[in-house]
Amino acid sequence: DAEGTKTLLHKLADRGVNYIDTARGYTVSEEYLGYALEGIRDRFIIATKSMARTKEAMAEDIEKSLHNLRTDHIELYQVHNPSMEQLDQVQAAGGALEALQEARATGKIEHIGLTAHSVEVFCPGSGA
């Protein structure tokens, strides 16, 4: 719950933990973390991710993440687990990458990342 998350984050911060990885799709994770980070946000690096593939959907998810996490910036925002076809969509005109680049240009995010469950996404044609 939110109170348990707050207690845990404060204990972790006191022990030197400073990195949080979450995602839009992790049910209430961003909301609980946003509540828990009040007053200690500057002690953490936040990474989150989205399954959005279009510019419009990604821009919406970035705004939702900022709102839920109760912050004005996110250090790392990632495209989460695209297939090869989806990766093409993400990079094409009107794709999610455009929204991420715009968010970085305005200071809403610092870094753009990619997560994958397949080596093929990172090394196309490698046979790995």
Feature-to-residue mapping (PLM):
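N-terminal binding-site loop/beta-alpha segment at the start of enzyme catalytic domains
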Residues: 1-44, 59, 105
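Glycine/proline-rich, positively charged
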Residues: 3, 10, 14, 55-128
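Structural detector of well-ordered beta-strand residues that form the stable sheet scaffold
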Residues: 20, 45-47, 110-115
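Acidic active-site catalytic centers that drive phospho-/nucleotidyl reactions
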Residues: 21, 49, 75
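Short beta->alpha linker loops
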Residues: 24-28, 50-53, 116-118
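Short alpha-helix boundary/capping motifs
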Residues: 40-42, 48-49, 61, 94
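Short, basic/glycine-rich phosphate-binding loops at helix/coil junctions
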Residues: 41-45, 77-80
